[in-house]
């Protein structure tokens, strides 16, 4: 199943990025997070290899949208002289999540049930979607590149 994720990242990422870069970053990130949340939550409802494989495909499509688009958003809102700090804090958040997730997941597994881990991921994802939808309504949170450097093109 992890091989599916890796193969999709290698062979599908460019096409997804080519499509998503045409749109505003916050709504695209929200859509990607919704797909990601659905993929995580679907694990709680699936049985057997095919079900878990389908969950991975759905989750990976969300990942292919969220990771580069959110990174672009952070780079765009950061002043050029603070871009490294902004990206550092952004990736620190990812690192903290990866550090705390096994502890929280283990507690959910022991206290409630294994499916609670995936339902918890769904709830966190939907909360993120709600937050992104709220932020996208305020123009001051819309991203515009803050650098005098020309944009990077593939």
Task: Tell where the protein language model's regions lie, with residue ranges.
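Transmembrane alpha-helical cores of Major Facilitator Superfamily
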Residues: 3, 7, 34, 57, ...
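Helix-to-loop junctions at the C-terminal end of transmembrane segments
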Residues: 11-25, 109
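Structural signature of the two symmetry-related core transmembrane helices
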Residues: 27-42
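Helix-loop junctions at membrane interfaces in 12-TM secondary transporters
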Residues: 44-56
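Intracellular juxtamembrane helix-capping segments at the cytosolic ends
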Residues: 65-78
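Loop-to-transmembrane helix entry/capping segments in MFS-fold secondary transporters
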Residues: 80-90
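A membrane-interface helix-boundary motif in multi-pass transporters
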Residues: 107-125
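Multi-pass alpha-helical transporter architecture, strongest
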Residues: 121-154
């Amino acid at each position: 199943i992890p091989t599916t994720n890796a193969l999709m990242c290698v062979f599908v990422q460019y096409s997804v990025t080519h499509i998503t870069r045409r749109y505003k970053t916050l709504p695209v990130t929200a859509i990607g997070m919704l797909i990601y949340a659905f993929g995580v939550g679907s694990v709680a409802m699936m049985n057997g290899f095919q079900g878990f494989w389908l969950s991975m495909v759905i989750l990976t499509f969300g990942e292919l949208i969220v990771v580069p688009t959110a990174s672009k958003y952070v780079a765009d809102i950061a002043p050029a002289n603070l871009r490294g700090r902004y990206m550092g804090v952004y990736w620190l958040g990812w690192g903290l999540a990866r550090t705390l997730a096994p502890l929280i997941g283990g507690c959910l597994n022991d206290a409630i049930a294994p499916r609670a881990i995936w339902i918890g991921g769904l709830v966190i994802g939907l909360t993120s979607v709600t937050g992104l939808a709220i932020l996208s309504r305020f123009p001051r949170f819309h991203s515009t590149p803050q650098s005098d450097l020309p944009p990077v093109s593939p």
